[in-house]
Amino acid sequence: MTGGALLVAGTTSDAGKSMVVAGLCRLLARKGVRVAPFKAQNMSNNSAVTVDGGEIGRAQAMQARAAGLDPSVRFNPVLLKPGSDRTSQLVVRGRVTGTVSATDYITHRDRLADVVADELASLRAEFDVVLCEGAGSPAEINLRRTDLANMGLARRAHLPVIVVGDIDRGGVLAHLFGTVAVLHPDDQALIAGFVVNKFRGDPTLLAPGLDQLHDLTGRPTYGVIPYSDELWMDTEDSVSVVAGRTIGRPTPPRGADGLRVAAVRLPRISNSTDIEALACEPGVTVRWVTDPADVADADVVVLPGTKATVADLQWLRTAGLAEPIAAHAGAGRPLLGICGGFQMLCRHIDDAVESRAGRVDGLGLLDADIAFAAEKTLRHRTTPLQGYEIHHGQVTRCAADDWAGIGVRRDAVYGTHWHGLFDNDGFRRAWLADAAAAAGRSGFVVADDIDVSARRDAQLDVMADLLQNHLDLDAALGLVDAGPPPRPTISTGIT
């Protein structure tokens, strides 16, 4: 393998392509292969900060770790961060270049295509294998002319494509067949085969369907990957962040009491992965909520980050959540705001950048004011804790108490711009002990043996092992050097 590449696409968002790429990165890295991830264009508010202060999709940061690499803007040269249904912040090579609508974006397409091509060529020259991840679905045929991340990338770089389908959602055979069938014949020619993901049960029962899929498409299924409830961390797509859903796999408490955490599912939520570390703790149950009753019933409430602070603050009020949040804080129970959630807790927000709403009243639970700056703060932090910052909002006035050098607090109300704080094991344990005491859960015992970073790394090994055991690796990875194999055209394809 020298400079070869493969594109892993998906029938839908959250089909599992990010984890398949991550698992393959880990698998190849174990074998001593120099492998790098690549996603030409990502649309996500779950981002990470590289060591040199650039911004990329969190999935590519995870894939880099799987490959034994530091996250780099080269792995995700174009990032779109939706701030509304019609506009997104455009990040190119890790830096914000402006806010664009879908129509505006088309005008940038040629320039961005050159950026993508340059970065992919550079990676192929440096690494043995580059594993590319598609975006959403390649079957968005209305976007074919401007596509940078799926078949557009595959055409320009002549990449073989494997399509991943999520059978847990139902209809996977139709998804896989239909994805190929609606493609232009030139694009169909690049689809090498399929992977079925998240299968539960006896795979022999699926075999007749896969045989028929092969007959219909002329393409093999390279593997059927079993469902694993260990693969729940580092989710990127907001479609997986569902109100009412419990995060992770709750485990029994070590003491007499558990701790119930309500994480508010904001419409423009960002960096939802901040909450995952809490869900690793025994006795801590974390749920995404939008119901005021769930806030009132919780021991701890978390307001996570958002790409639209002012708009989501208005949503909080309209949804009837502002009052129970204030009542929760007034009762002395723990309330944490992270990044945009922190900004909402302050007295005033001056926003001439994102919403351009001017001065608006915050929830007033922290005695501080926020003003949005045109230039985004991007910092990778190592002291006093590991973490990172991604925000336009700046604290312009603060009469609240300092919180461990990473934020502010008033009694049991906490606010910080730092992401990734709870991945620091000692800090998380100390905060949970304080939160349990403030919530009146005196019987809650903090575990001293939970290593979140090790858990994140372990799930990459889980995925790699699943691929090792359930994927025809010789056939799938053989595509890297061989390129797209001859495949028939489905006659219903669009010409």
Curated annotation (Swiss-Prot):
Q: Please provide the Gene Ontology terms (biological process) for this protein.
A: cobalamin biosynthetic process
For this protein, the record's HAMAP family field holds:
CobQ
Member of which family?
A: Belongs to the CobB/CobQ family. CobQ subfamily.
InterPro entries xrefs: Class_I_gatase-like, CobQ/CobB/MinD/ParA_Nub-bd_dom, CobQ_GATase1, CobQ_N, CobQ_synth, GATase_3, P-loop_NTPase
Q: In which pathway does it act?
A: Cofactor biosynthesis; adenosylcobalamin biosynthesis
Keyword hit for Translocase = no
Q: Output this protein's name.
A: Cobyric acid synthase
Q: Which residue ranges does the record assign to the GATase cobBQ-type domain?
A: 258-427
Write out the function statement from the record: Catalyzes amidations at positions B, D, E, and G on adenosylcobyrinic A,C-diamide. NH(2) groups are provided by glutamine, and one molecule of ATP is hydrogenolyzed for each amidation.
Please list the residues that make up the active site.
Answer: C339 (nucleophile), H419
Gene designation: cobQ
